[in-house]
Regions:
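Basic/aromatic-rich interaction segments and small domains that mediate binding to polyanionic partners
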Residues: 4-49
């Protein structure tokens, strides 16, 4: 289950993200590598920490 502050890995390219906010089936995430923020669907991620 994704919660604010969760460390996430994107399915497919395995990039790492941190969850900042959650609304319905969308999650605001920030990339650890490039520091960019974007709203994406929760199903694009798996929780790794």
């Amino acid at each position: 289950m994704i919660e604010v502050g969760s460390l996430l890995r994107m399915w497919g390219n395995h990039s790492r993200w941190i969850a900042l906010d959650i609304i319905a089936d969308q999650v605001l995430v920030v990339s650890q590598k490039r520091n960019n923020k974007v709203w994406l669907n929760k199903s694009a991620f798996e929780v790794i920490g």
